[in-house]
Design a protein with these regions (language model features):
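Short sequence motifs at beta-strands and strand-loop junctions characteristic
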Residues: 55-58, 95-97, 153-155, 186-188, ...
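Outer-membrane beta-barrel "beta-signal"
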Residues: 335, 379-395
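Extracellular loop and loop/strand-boundary signature of outer-membrane beta-barrel proteins
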Residues: 48-51, 91, 147-148, 180-181, ...
Length: 395
C-alpha cells in the first residue's frame, strides 16, 4: 500500500473505534461522505468533442470525520476533517494534502455563537452559496462561468479564525480572518471575509464580502504557503489577472419557496486589483447576474434551471468587453434517502475579448466554459455544451 492509503485506513479505523467509546463522555465522532460519478459529454473541449468519466458533480466525492463533545452549559467542542478524492482513480483531490477540503476545531455555544480555527470555507461562501445556482444545479454546470465569484466550493482558507453569531430573529452574522504567514509582510497572503444571512419561513437572503491578498510572490494566489492555499479558481476567464495584488468579491442572493417551487436571484461583483508587479494596469471587474427556479414534481423527482450573465469590464486594452451567457438544467431522481440519479445539461455562449495568460498586451477572444467543469478546457468556438448523467451515494 502507498503511504496515503495507509493514512486513510488508519483514520477510518480510528473513527470507528472512537465512535464506539465516545458515548461515555457524551461525545460523538461520525464518519461521513459522498461517492459521485458520471459519464460526461462536451461538444468542444479545446477543439474536440469528448466523452469521459467525471466524478464529483452533484456532490464532490469525499469523506470526513465530524466530532462533537458536550462540555456542559450549552458549550460543545467540535471538529471537522474532510478529504476529497477522485473516484475514478482513487487519487487524493490535492496531492500532499489529506484534508484538503476543510480541517478545523472550535467551540460552539447556544448563547454566544461559534468560534473555529483551521482550514475553512469562507462566510462569503457558506452564507451566500446555498442561495446561488451552484447549490441548486451543481457547481459542475450550475456555477457561474469559471466560478468567477467563488460561490461554488473553490476557495478554502488556511490559518483562519471564524466567528459565527447565534441566530436572532432569523439573522445570523459571521466573520473570518486568515493570517498570511509571511514574515515581515502581514498585509500579504491574508484573507478577510464577512457575511450576513436572514432566513425566515419561505424567505432566505444573504450577502457576503471576501478579500484575498496575494502573497506577492510569482505564485500569487496559487502560493500554497498563504491563506488561500492554491484553492483559488483559475480559468480562461481570470487567467490574465492572476498577478493582481488582491481580489475582492461581493455577492448577494436570495430564495423564495412557495410549496414545491423555489425561485431565486443572485448578483456578484468581482474585482482584480493591480499592484506594482501585476501584468495588467487597470482594475478588472466581473459583474454577474443570475436567476434560478426549482420544482419538486414528486417526493423523489425534481427539476431545476438557471440563467447567468457575466459582463467583464472594458480595460487593459480590451476594446470589446467579454460577455458570458449560461443556461443550465438539472434533473434528479432519488432512489432512497442516500442514493440519487441525476442528469445535467448546460450551454455557455461568449462574446468580446479578454486578457490571455500573459496579461496586458495579450488580448484574446473570450472563450466559453460551462460552470467550473471546464476551467482550462474551453471551446474553440463561441459556444460550449456539457451533458452529464450520473449517480451519487451519501453515507
Amino acid at each position: 500500500m502507498t503511504a496515503p492509503v495507509n493514512r486513510y485506513a488508519i483514520l477510518i479505523l480510528s473513527a470507528a473505534s472512537l465512535g464506539t467509546t465516545a458515548a461515555h463522555a457524551q461525545s460523538s465522532v461520525t464518519l461521513y461522505g459522498v461517492v459521485d460519478d458520471s459519464i460526461a459529454y462536451v461538444n468542444n473541449q479545446q477543439g474536440h468533442s469528448n466523452v469521459y468519466m467525471r466524478d464529483g458533480n452533484l456532490y464532490a466525492s469525499k469523506f470526513g470525520l465530524r466530532g462533537d463533545e458536550d462540555l456542559g452549559g450549552g458549550t460543545h467542542a467540535i471538529f471537522d476533517l474532510q478529504a476529497g478524492f477522485n473516484l475514478n482513480t482513487g487519487a487524493q483531490a490535492a496531492a500532499g494534502t489529506i484534508f484538503n477540503r476543510q480541517a478545523f476545531v472550535g467551540l460552539r455555544n447556544v448563547r454566544y455563537g461559534t468560534v473555529t480555527a483551521g482550514r475553512q470555507y469562507t462566510p462569503y461562501f457558506l452564507f451566500v452559496g446555498p442561495y446561488a445556482s451552484s447549490s441548486w444545479l451543481t457547481g459542475a454546470t450550475g456555477a457561474h462561468p469559471g466560478d468567477i465569484d467563488g460561490l461554488d466550493t473553490t476557495i478554502r482558507v488556511n490559518n483562519s479564525v471564524t466567528y459565527t453569531s447565534p441566530t436572532f430573529a432569523g439573522l445570523t452574522a459571521s466573520a473570518m480572518y486568515a493570517f498570511g504567514g509571511i514574515a515581515g509582510a502581514t498585509g500579504k497572503g491574508n484573507t478577510f471575509s464577512a457575511a450576513l444571512r436572514y432566513a425566515n419561513g419561505p424567505i432566505g437572503i444573504a450577502a457576503g464580502y471576501l478579500r484575498i491578498n496575494s502573497s506577492g510572490s510569482s505564485a500569487g494566489f496559487q502560493n500554497p504557503a498563504t491563506a488561500a492555499s492554491g484553492s483559488f479558481a483559475v480559468s480562461v476567464l481570470n487567467q490574465g489577472y492572476l498577478t493582481a495584488k488582491a481580489v475582492e468579491q461581493v455577492a448577494a442572493a436570495g430564495n423564495y419557496t412557495l410549496g414545491d417551487l423555489t425561485m431565486g436571484l443572485n448578483y456578484s461583483n468581482v474585482k482584480y486589483l493591480p499592484g506594482n508587479g501585476s501584468a495588467f494596469t487597470d482594475t478588472a471587474v466581473f459583474n454577474t447576474y443570475g436567476a434560478l427556479a426549482a420544482y419538486r414534481f414528486t417526493p423523489t423527482f425534481s427539476v431545476a434551471g438557471a440563467f447567468a450573465y457575466t459582463l467583464a469590464s472594458k480595460a487593459n486594452g480590451v476594446a470589446s468587453a467579454a460577455r458570458y451567457q449560461q443556461y443550465s438544467l438539472k434533473e434528479s431522481y432519488s432512489l432512497s434517502k442516500r442514493t440519487t440519479l441525476y442528469a445535467l445539461q448546460a450551454y455557455t455562449h461568449s462574446s468580446g475579448q479578454t486578457l490571455g495568460a500573459q496579461g496586458a498586451g495579450h488580448i484574446v477572444d473570450a472563450a466559453p466554459i460551462v460552470g467550473d467543469s471546464q476551467q482550462l478546457t474551453p471551446s474553440t468556438t463561441r459556444g460550449q455544451f456539457v451533458g452529464m448523467a450520473g449517480i451519487a451515494v451519501t453515507f
